[in-house]
């Protein structure tokens, strides 16, 4: 309800601002403010038909979104597209890539492979098989040769580590934090609402005080590979970075030192 006031404040602050949105509430006034403030947008596009996109985003979302995306493109507003790949839209990925990067002129296309986490544990019928995951990765490598840094496979299994250090260090608590609607501070979004990983509250404490708390140490190298119950015995632990993410297993109901459920190694 306060988006107009937020946009006004963002323009005044002269900060680099990126808003993640479904774009459905963008109107002419808000688009003008976004353009004036050089605000960047991150928008989800999960299919090239209403059948595939609306399956994830709700009935009627696709037609509204396409209309708004065309306006943003004409207004030369900077935006990126995020697509979550699942069984229903897998056959449209080539089309989504072409439409996003060529026709719309999106700065970047982020591809995420749907993982069996959260609500997806009850919707495993649309989660990609191991073979389909491999096919997506091959498609990504092929398209990356054409689009370079404009296309990014953003999920964790695409990442590799060349570190030989046994310390477990995550971006959470080092280069990012998550703040909920009550100004509670967490290491990342997977810790939100988990009291064990609440690092402080911005109403009661200064961010600098919260940031310097010893609570962060388990994300800053105090944990080592030997402390991990599953990953320490994996032959790929030297190159895999999924071991560094400790809150995804917690989010899944596992322990802090467990591996994530979709690791097949």
Where in the sequence are the language-model features?
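A structural signal for well-ordered alpha-helical scaffolds and beta->alpha junctions
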Residues: 3, 49, 65, 93, ...
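Alpha-helix boundary recognition
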Residues: 11, 35, 70-73, 101, ...
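A C-terminal junction/extension of Radical SAM enzymes
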Residues: 92, 114-194, 226-228, 233, ...
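Flexible mid-to-C-terminal extensions adjoining Fe-S/redox cofactors in radical SAM and related proteins
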Residues: 192-265
């Amino acid at each position: 309800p306060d988006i107009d006031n937020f946009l006004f404040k963002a323009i005044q602050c002269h900060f680099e601002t990126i808003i993640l949105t479904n774009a459905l509430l963008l109107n002419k006034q808000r688009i003008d403010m976004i353009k004036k403030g050089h605000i960047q947008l991150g928008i989800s596009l999960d299919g090239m038909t209403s059948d595939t996109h609306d399956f994830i985003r709700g009935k009627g979302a696709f037609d509204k979104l396409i209309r708004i995306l065309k306006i943003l493109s004409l207004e030369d507003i900077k935006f990126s597209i995020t697509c979550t790949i699942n069984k229903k839209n897998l056959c449209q990925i080539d089309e989504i890539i072409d439409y996003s990067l060529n026709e719309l002129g999106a700065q970047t296309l982020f591809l995420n492979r749907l993982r069996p986490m959260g609500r997806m544990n009850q919707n495993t019928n649309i989660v990609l098989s191991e073979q389909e995951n491999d096919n997506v990765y091959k498609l990504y490598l092929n398209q990356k040769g054409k689009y370079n840094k404009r296309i990014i496979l953003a999920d964790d299994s695409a990442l590799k580590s060349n570190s030989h250090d046994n310390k477990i260090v995550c971006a959470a608590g080092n280069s990012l934090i998550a703040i909920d609607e009550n100004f509670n501070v967490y290491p990342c979004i997977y810790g939100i609402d988990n009291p064990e990983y609440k690092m402080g509250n911005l109403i009661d404490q200064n961010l600098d005080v919260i940031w310097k708390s010893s609570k962060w140490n388990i994300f800053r190298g105090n944990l080592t590979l030997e402390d991990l119950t599953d990953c320490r015995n994996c032959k790929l632990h030297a190159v895999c970075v999924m071991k560094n993410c400790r809150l995804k297993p917690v989010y899944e109901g596992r322990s802090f030192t467990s591996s994530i459920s979709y690791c097949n190694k």
